[in-house]
Amino acid sequence: MKQKAFCLLLFLFICESLFEQRILEKEIYRLPTTWELFVNALIFVESRGDENAVGSKNDVGVLQITPIYVEEVNRILGKNIYNLEDRYSKEKSLEMFEIVQMYHNPQKNVDKAIKLHNPRAGKQYAVKIKRQMDYLRTK
């Protein structure tokens, strides 16, 4: 009887371990969402991932955020949470980007997101981002 109970417990332990391993494997090999591809493509197009990148119009960081963009984020939040130095932080730049997008583009439409992020950019800007998304999708 003890041997059967031991075998049953061992079997359950092995099953649980395999189940946990499958969950971890799925998490590791999960394909990125369209939005994640878009954000990564945008970062590449804007700065090639350089947190210290400086553009020609006082735009800086991985997402080339302008002072007006920081003002808009703080306006949305109703208080001054972010400052101009935060543009140099990838993490804070992404937070600001998500705040603007969630406020103006809650459905996460990529075309609208591109226009919101850089309203003065032409069609070629959107084409560059979408090409980069396609490239990232194949990696």
What kind of region is each of these model predictions?
Residues 51-52, 127:
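Alpha-helical elements of the RecA-like P-loop NTPase motor core of helicases
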Residues 53-77, 116:
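Short, surface-exposed glycine/acidic/tryptophan-bearing loops
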Residues 34-41, 107-116:
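Alpha-helical scaffolds flanking conserved acidic
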Residues 2, 118-120:
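Short, flexible beta-strand-to-coil junctions
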Residues 2-7, 11-51, 76-77, 90-102, ...:
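Export/targeting segments at the very N-terminus of extracytoplasmic proteins
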Residues 38, 58-61, 125:
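Residues that flank catalytic or metal-binding motifs in active/ligand-binding sites
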Residues 67-112, 121-136:
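Alpha-helical segment that forms one wall of the substrate-binding/catalytic cleft
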